[in-house]
Swiss-Prot record:
It comes from Caenorhabditis elegans. The keyword Nucleotide-binding applies. It comes from the Eukaryota. InterPro entries: ATP-synt_VA_C, ATPase_a/bsu_AS, ATPase_F1/V1/A1_a/bsu_N, ATPase_F1/V1/A1_a/bsu_nucl-bd, ATPase_V1-cplx_bsu, P-loop_NTPase, V-ATPase_su_B/beta. Its main location: cytoplasm. Non-catalytic subunit of the V1 complex of vacuolar(H+)-ATPase (V-ATPase), a multisubunit enzyme composed of a peripheral complex (V1) that hydrolyzes ATP and a membrane integral complex (V0) that translocates protons. V-ATPase is responsible for acidifying and maintaining the pH of intracellular compartments and in some cell types, is targeted to the plasma membrane, where it is responsible for acidifying the extracellular environment. In neurons, required for necrotic cell death probably by promoting intracellular acidification. One of its GO terms (cellular component) is proton-transporting V-type ATPase, V1 domain. PROSITE patterns: ATPASE_ALPHA_BETA. Disulfide bonds: none annotated. This is V-type proton ATPase subunit B 2. One of its GO terms (biological process) is vacuolar acidification. Keywords: ATP-binding, Cytoplasm, Hydrogen ion transport, Ion transport, Nucleotide-binding, Transport. GO terms for molecular function: ATP binding; proton-transporting ATPase activity, rotational mechanism. ATP binds at residue 392.
Length: 501
């Protein structure tokens, strides 16, 4: 086999297959290591937080990448946030510690931030800037892609219709996730959102139905951590290794002791890799982003350093638009085999769902999975509260041919009974058990069994969709048939067969 070092790119002549790796790599080299003259300045005017202000710059361009060389020779990367006639405001991804206004030099490259991508990135661990930190060799890039991605034409989007089976009943039956959907996990500090996300990653796959051709899928996972502690990063890495999926996982880790400003580019680099796996390699990619609250706080820090007019709780007014540039990169595209499904995790400050971060996230994404503190206190795992949880694409991913014909009606009836049980429980605290009617007592019984048998399950318990639906019917048999108003008579005839006492 010919060594890569022996290949002279200038010796390749004649027609070239554009799909060969050597051609892709040659194109990437020409594109990124151009010999255009670059401009270097030693005119740093000042440093403000994560920002460096450079004066007397000729034609600075918005989003242009800047190489900043410190007096000790260390090189850091930055990006132009604001440009005027002869001034540029540069955000430094690795932080501004050690930047000397007199001796620091800035090289304006004239290009945007492009991330090297390759199929070899699977099974590797990178820092928040996309550099390997697993003591492995550098990745040989197949291409260099803009980290901001390319906007998908809405006409070319495919509506998500294939349900992902997570093995968790509270999600599969009540809040079904479709392939290509973006659905966040709303949690709070101290709740097991990491364990739930790891279980979804471990057990996630297409619905396996008896009598149907259940093909194996080309699956990959991209995990991006922003501002997490070492314990969280180690938990996910260990979980991926134990379940044997580490070869299909690409990890990007920005830890709590890493520069805050780096959190701005970490999710974008991760999604650029995911888009390459999905749209160029035909893989079905699941992207887990944690913690989006840390990302939003980094955004607020930059906004404060630029002295912009703050919005609610000090967050910038453009945070909605900025979050949308991340969340909207999920989906499916016509003519491409792969898909991107996003599960962002965000911890709500003070468990407040009206906080700007979960509030704006809920506007953009297609539903949410809500982790409840009260269920967690009662040792129910996973503590998913099905009432505020929602999946807006569930209606197109369930039903006959996809899951089972009773799925939608069964879910509606379980919702109604659980909500009624909650109302009766609140009323019982006021008037006492003696004042409750026989129907109210049935709702209380259903409430207890629903949380114990349906919501609660083991961390490694993988229920099929059929098993979860059957558990739902077992619970509804608590009620007489005439009380189940939301299920058609034909389905009751088929599935409601009450055992004789």
């Amino acid at each position: 086999m010919t060594e890569a070092s022996e290949i002279n790119l200038s010796d390749i002549k004649g027609p070239i297959d554009v799909n060969t790796p050597i051609t892709n790599h040659r194109t990437a080299l020409i594109q990124n290591y151009s010999t255009k003259p670059k401009l270097t300045y030693q005119t740093v005017f000042g440093v403000n937080g994560p920002l460096v202000i450079v004066h007397n710059v000729k034609f600075p361009m918005f989003n242009e990448i800047v190489k900043i060389t410190l007096p000790n020779g260390q090189i850091r990367m930055g990006q132009v946030l604001e440009s005027s006639k002869n001034k540029a405001v540069v955000q430094v991804f690795e932080g501004t510690t050690g930047v000397d206004a007199k001796f620091t030099t800035c090289e304006f490259t004239g290009d945007i931030f492009r991330s090297p991508v390759s199929l070899d990135m699977l099974g590797r661990i990178f820092n928040g800037s996309g550099k390997p930190i697993d003591k492995g060799p550098p990745v040989l890039p197949e291409d260099y892609l803009d980290i901001n991605g390319q906007p998908i034409n809405p006409f070319n989007r495919i509506y998500p219709e294939e349900m992902i089976q997570t093995g968790i009943s509270a999600i599969d039956v009540m809040n079904s996730i479709a392939r290509g959907q973006k659905i966040p996990i709303f949690s709070a500090a101290g709740l097991p959102h990491n364990e739930i996300a790891a279980q979804i990653v471990r057990q996630g796959g297409l619905v396996q139905l008896p009598g149907r051709n259940n093909e194996t899928v080309n699956f990959a996972i991209v995990f991006a951590a922003m501002g997490v502690n070492m314990e969280t990063a180690r938990f996910f890495k260990q979980d991926f290794e134990e379940c044997g999926s580490m070869d299909n996982v690409c990890l990007f880790l920005n830890l709590a002791n890493d520069p805050t400003i780096e959190r701005i580019i970490t999710p974008r680099i991760a999604l650029t890799a995911a888009e390459f796996f999905a749209y160029h390699c035909g893989k079905h990619v699941l992207v887990v982003l944690t913690d989006m609250s840390s990302y939003a706080e980094a955004l607020r820090e930059i906004s404060a350093a630029r002295e912009e007019v703050p919005g609610r709780r000090g967050f910038p007014g453009y945070m909605y638009t900025d979050l949308a540039t991340i969340y909207e990169r999920a989906g499916r595209v016509k003519g491409r085999e792969g898909s991107i499904t996003q599960i962002p995790i965000l911890t709500m400050p003070n468990n407040d769902i009206t906080h700007p971060i979960p509030d704006l996230t809920g506007y953009i994404t297609e539903g949410q999975i809500y982790i409840d503190k009260q269920l967690h206190k009662r040792l129910i795992y996973p503590p998913i509260d099905v009432l505020p949880s929602l999946s807006r694409l569930m209606k197109s991913a369930v039903g006959e041919g996809m899951t089972r014909e009773d799925h939608s009606d069964l879910s509606n009836q379980l919702y109604a009974c659980y909500a009624m049980g909650k109302d009766v429980q609140a009323m019982k605290a006021v008037v006492g058990v003696e004042a409750l009617s026989p129907d109210d007592l049935l709702y209380l019984e259903f409430l207890a069994k629903f949380e114990k048998n349906f919501i609660a399950q083991g961390r490694y318990e993988n229920r099929t969709i059929v098993e979860s639906l059957n558990i739902g019917w077992e619970l509804l048999r608590i009620f007489p048939r005439e009380m189940l108003k939301r299920i058609p008579e034909t389905l009751l005839e088929k599935y409601y067969k009450r055992k004789k006492q």
